[in-house]
Amino acid sequence: MTRDSSESSDRSVHADWSAYAAAYDLLSEHNPAYQALLQRFEGFLATIETPRVIHEIGGGTGNYTDIAARAFPESRIRLFEPDENMIKSAQTKLAAYQNIDYDTRALEDVDAAEPADLVICVHALYAMPAQEQRLADLRRLLNPGGLLYLVDLGHYMNVTDWRRYLFSHLKKERGLIGALQIFWQGREIAKQNTTIREAQKTGVYWTHTSAQIASAVTTAGFDILRQERVYLGYSDLLVCRAKP
C-alpha cells in the first residue's frame, strides 16, 4: 500500500498505513481472497521471461516482492514504499534476499534512471493522488515492451461483507474461539478498512469501473493483455505492456 501525498492532506479521511502495517500480514494469511491474488501473481510470473529489473510500487510489507525474488533470484528488484512501518516490515520479511533494494520515495518522485522490465503495483494506485499522472509515471518507469502487473481496489469497500466473509472462513478453519482471537488481533485492519471506505465515499481515494481503469491505462501508454475482476469483485487486475 502507498499512503496519500500532501495533495490530499487537507482532507480529514485517509487510512493510517503505519497502523495498518502492524496487523496486515496476520489477516492476509487467513484471507483466501488475498491468497488467491498471490497465487495469480505467482502463476503470471511463471509465464514470462526473467526480467532484468523489477520495480514494485507501493510494495507494503513485501508479499509480492517476496514471490518475485523467489521466482527470479537473478533479477534486480527495488521495492518502493513511503510508509516507514510498512517498509520496515518488508525489510524484516525479505532480509534473506540479496537482490532487493528499498526506497521510501513516492511514485511521483521516482526517476527512471534504470527502467524496469516488470513493474508491480497492487492495491496502491487508488490511494495515490492524480491517478492518471501516476499511470503515466508507471509507464515512464518501464522499458518499451515492459510489463505492468496492476491490481487496483476501484470498487467501494463493503466492510460488513468482508467481515462476514473472513469470519466465516476463520470459523471453519480455527473454530469460533480461534476466529474471535484472530479478529481481535487484527482489529486495526477493520478500523482502517472502514476509513478506506469513507475515503472512497468522499473522493479522497479513487473509485472506478473496470472500463474506466482500462481507458486510463490505455491513455497512459499501455496495451492491455489481460483484464479481470478479482478480490471478490472489488479489484481489477490488468496485465499490460508498455507501448514503444
Descriptions of predicted regions:
Residues M1-E49, N63, I67, M86, Y149-L180:
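Conserved class I S-adenosyl-L-methionine
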Residues H55-D109:
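Class I SAM-dependent methyltransferase SAM/SAH-binding core
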Residues V110-V119:
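A short acidic, Gly/Pro-enriched loop at the edge of an enzyme's catalytic core
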Residues L118-Q131:
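A short SAM/SAH-binding and catalytic strip from SAM-dependent methyltransferases
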Residues E132-P144:
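A short glycine-rich, Lys/Arg-flanked "PGG" loop and its adjoining helix->strand segment in the class I
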Residues G203-A220:
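Short alpha-helix
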Residues A220-F222, R226-P244:
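Core SAM-dependent methyltransferase catalytic element
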